[in-house]
Amino acid sequence: MREVIMGYQGEMSLKGLNRNQFESAMMKILRYRLKTVGKFRVYCTQSTFYMEPEEEDIDMDLAFDRVKTVFGLAALSRAVVCEKDFNTICQTAEDYLGDSLHGIRTFKVEARRADKSFPMTSPELMRELGAYLLGKHNYLKVDVHNPDFKVIVEVRDYGAYIHGPKIPGEGGLPVGTSGRALNMLSGGIDSPVAAYRMAKRGLGLDHIHFASPPYTSERAKLKVKALAQLITPYTGSTNLFVVPYTKPQEYIRDNAPDVLFTVLMRRSMMRIANVIAKKQGCEALVTGESLAQVTSQTVKALQCTDAAQDLPILRPLIGMDKTEIIETSRHINTFETSILPYEDCCTIFTPPHPKIRPELDEILEAEAGMPGLAQLEAEAAENAERIRIRITDDVDFVG
């Protein structure tokens, strides 16, 4: 009895002539995720990815955990493969899934015969295998509409694959197939969720964080690093750029109108992010902004922010409310870390009554009165610290 992991395509199967490129990217990602677990053969046929261990004693629980968060898979199964012989299929189904049939009342057999050379039709295989399992578990009843458990048999080119119910995958597209962007990782709830949602659309990501010591602490920086690590099961390995932002932030505080401070700071950050993004080959910036969530996220304020640089700014949370964002943060296991009470440079020096609808003309006028800001921004970008975040790294931060 040989166990395998099966991953089923979703949106990828609709890609037409480009489909091979997406499948190749997916197989590369799956191989990378599995290489620290053991040696696997990874291939794709009939819209399904197969991950077959080529070594003995591989931890299949760990292997499944490594691939279940890969974007591009609509569903996954842990299956066993056996010879395409009816008696062998029956015995293998009982050996592999028999324990799962204890303690339930109803079940159903589903069969798919992709290999038409198999002598039984799909309905015949369902009926006969169901009868065999009923003979082994006479307390069970068949319920084809709402069973407690499904036994699924897929007769394919390379054998008969037997498994229980499919487990939903993350869907989306393989990371990297839609380009690369730089995500503004603040340390709050929103920005990790923004990274997750854009990675789901196939976008490869690096992160940028702005630190303002002594106003922000080393613990705050470690918290952001932990967030970057927590989302690597979805984004894959990535880079985190930590920008020393104290001097530009103090300069804006000391030389700009108080009510415009927040928007001016956001524009300054965008300019620095633009420089680093282009050096890394990124084609866009990603933020966790949600419309009207805070005063710097009104349409007017966002318009002023966008005008500071020339890369597209992607805002995947723009129409989400806080409850939806929090639900996603819990799903990706970042919520508890995000709410740890460490300083965020976006909240220091915040004026009590910032302007909600700033005009671009007044923003440009305020920046004209800060001739030294460009040099401080250039120095901050040049001195950014690059931290490599790998998917196998342990999250070692404890709040």
For each predicted feature, which ranges?
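RNA-binding accessory domains that recognize and position tRNA/RNA substrates
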Residues: 1-182, 192-238, 307, 355-360, ...
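Active-site adenylate/phosphate-handling loop in enzymes that bind or generate adenylated species
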Residues: 131-133, 166, 172-178, 245, ...
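Conserved G/P- and acidic residue-centered "switch" motifs that form tight phosphate/ATP-binding loops
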Residues: 188
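A conserved beta-strand->alpha-helix junction
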Residues: 228-254, 342-344
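Small/polar glycine-rich anion-binding or flexible loop at a beta-alpha turn
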Residues: 293, 341-349
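A short alpha-helix-loop-beta-strand transition element characteristic
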Residues: 333-341
